[in-house]
Amino acid sequence: MGTLLLVHAHPDDECVATGGVMLRAHQEGHRVVLVTATRGEEGEIHNMDEASTRPRLGEVRTEELRRSCEILGVDRQEFLGYRDSGMAGTASNQDPRSFHRAPLSEAAGRLAVLLREERPDVVVTYTPDGTYGHPDHVKAHHVTVAALDLLEREGWRPAKAYLHA
């Protein structure tokens, strides 16, 4: 069986965009690897007390991601180690730790390490516009393409790379 590696920006993106693909791949016996750029620290809070949850939102969303990975049959989940950039035009966009401000070569290098380790048959990430323009989704697309370009120059590429809408 093969390996499917997906690159997402935040916890919950895996469910919203590719949950069905991930579960089916797992059910068919494929290895499923999820790379998440951030811990979703700037996400929206719908069903919890914002004042008490906001300071620990990254922890909350990391736990939600862990549970999601269990349900979807993810074999390995790794973070790239960046901070959620928030929506375009927000103050969080200016945080130097935010994903969308990360140097492309640095972030692509981090992803390339995981790609080298896994040698996936299929890689999935966002369209160039990040599906709806979120700065971290756009960055995830560019980082994935740059990492794949880097590895192709080293003589390797996955059998297929897909962009999800």
Positions of predicted regions on the chain:
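Active-site rim/loop-helix segments in enzyme catalytic domains that contact anionic ligands
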Residues: 1-118, 145-146
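The feature marks non-catalytic terminal segments
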Residues: 1-2, 150-165
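Short acidic-hydrophobic sequence patches enriched in Asp/Glu that either
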Residues: 57-60, 139-140, 157
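Short, well-ordered beta-to-alpha junction loops that form the rim of enzyme active sites
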Residues: 80-83, 125-129, 135, 163-165
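Active-site adenylate/phosphate-handling loop in enzymes that bind or generate adenylated species
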Residues: 110-152
